[in-house]
């Protein structure tokens, strides 16, 4: 039996009302999004009123445990790279691995400060004795996937989205096999990524990324494969760039890190209603893992541990707190 005119009109009105509600809901859901200037994906600020314990500044140190390979990696003396073999730069890198990794682990354990580790997936198999020793010192450190290695097996940026998905999946599988933990965070090798990287990491189950350098606050990046929590990782706070590219010695890094954190604390004190901030500070064994580097880092940690508004934490805890908001 055909519907009456009244029924048809009522149904049309109901459909129109439902459509309007859906459109309003969609507008509400996307409210606050803006295009990310690099990827073009929608990005939304995540406002955190405070961190656990009414803290206002979250600080996490990300320790890079990487595979470079013989003849690859950062150079302390660029004027000597043409030597064959280049003993000075090779031993500079090896010192960081042989001595610096455990030194950093001991420092954070002794001060009872959480540590996050950005791990090259090939490291545990290539240097098992060093990895075993470090994990005995730091059994609970958060593990962030940092690609296969940092030189010859970086992201296949020119090969398309699918190739990056395979690479990310392989990295996660290998880390899980070696460490027993499947990372939920990602930091691209040498911070060298492209628009496909964000989509690929989300597709492979990554929940947060350190490939974000443009804010003091958390944000959510909406990729075609799902969302990523973007944790601020300012380029100016990374020890390697400051040390090797700008010739900043550890005592200068000490001043930089202290000033950076304390200014965020000061801003929170003068404006208690402003959103809570976060900074992930990148450290490397051949810079911060030297005796002078560790001494400078120790003084920084001792100083900011005294601040009642600072939450010294790890990246997994930042993600968990943001997720629970």
Give residue spans per PLM region.
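Classical eukaryotic N-terminal signal peptides for Sec-dependent ER targeting/secretion
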Residues: 1-19
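Active-site-adjacent pocket scaffolds in enzyme catalytic domains
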Residues: 33-53, 173-177, 181-274
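Alpha-helix N-cap and loop-to-helix initiation/capping positions
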Residues: 159-166, 248-252, 292, 296
């Amino acid at each position: 039996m055909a519907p009456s005119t009244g029924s048809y009109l009522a149904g049309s009105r109901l459909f129109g009302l439902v459509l309007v509600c859906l459109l309003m809901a969609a507008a509400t859901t996307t409210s606050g999004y803006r295009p990310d200037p690099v990827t073009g994906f929608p990005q939304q600020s995540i406002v955190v009123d405070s961190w656990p314990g009414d803290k206002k500044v979250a600080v996490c140190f990300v320790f890079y445990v990487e595979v470079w390979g013989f003849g690859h990696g950062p150079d302390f003396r660029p004027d000597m790279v043409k030597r064959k073999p280049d003993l000075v730069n090779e031993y500079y890198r090896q010192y960081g691995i042989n001595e610096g990794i455990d030194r950093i682990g001991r420092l954070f354990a002794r001060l009872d400060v959480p540590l996050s580790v950005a791990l090259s997936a090939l490291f545990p198999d290539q240097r098992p004795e060093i990895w075993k020793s470090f994990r005995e010192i730091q059994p609970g450190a958060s593990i962030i996937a940092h690609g296969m290695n940092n030189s010859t097996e970086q992201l296949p940026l020119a090969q398309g989205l699918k190739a990056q998905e395979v690479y990310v999946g392989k990295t996660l599988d290998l880390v899980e096999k070696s460490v027993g933990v499947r990372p939920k965070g990602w930091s691209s090798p040498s911070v060298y990524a492209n628009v496909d990287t964000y989509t690929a990491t989300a597709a492979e189950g990554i929940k947060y990324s350190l490939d974000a350098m443009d804010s003091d606050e958390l944000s959510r990046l909406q990729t075609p494969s799902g969302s990523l929590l973007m944790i601020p990782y300012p380029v100016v706070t990374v020890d390697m760039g400051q040390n090797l590219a700008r010739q900043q010695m550890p005592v200068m890094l000490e001043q930089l890190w202290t000033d950076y954190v304390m200014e965020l604390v000061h801003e929170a004190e003068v404006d208690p209603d402003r959103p809570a901030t976060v900074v992930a500070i990148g450290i490397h064994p051949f810079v911060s893992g030297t005796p002078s580097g560790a001494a400078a880092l120790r003084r920084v940690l001792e100083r900011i541990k005294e601040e009642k508004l600072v939450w010294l934490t790890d990246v997994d805890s930042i993600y968990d707190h943001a997720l629970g908001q």
